[in-house]
């Protein structure tokens, strides 16, 4: 069996100032690392969304009744009942782009670094794997 990925979450109790306004919204979920088999029979680690107050139940991206508060999500992770937290984007006016496998030895590859530099007015972070980047900003559309 493959070893569970290392999770990089930072200090969840003190969210960065750029994301602080999002904590007032009831759009938060948690996720555990789960090892699943792909259609080809290989094993792959996934991060399925779970309800912040009850991580035994799935959260759905199109069902706000399955989302919770930031405080509930952080408490669930701190109790060890999930590995990380997530924010549901649907209808929020927030958009995110994940750049996978673009961090090498702690530094973004050149094209990813350039893209991030051009994405003014956004918040950027390293993904939980430590190997990717996420760009978060305001968005319109579905």
Where are these regions (language model features)?
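Conserved phosphate/metal-binding and DNA-contacting active-site motifs used
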Residues: 1-142
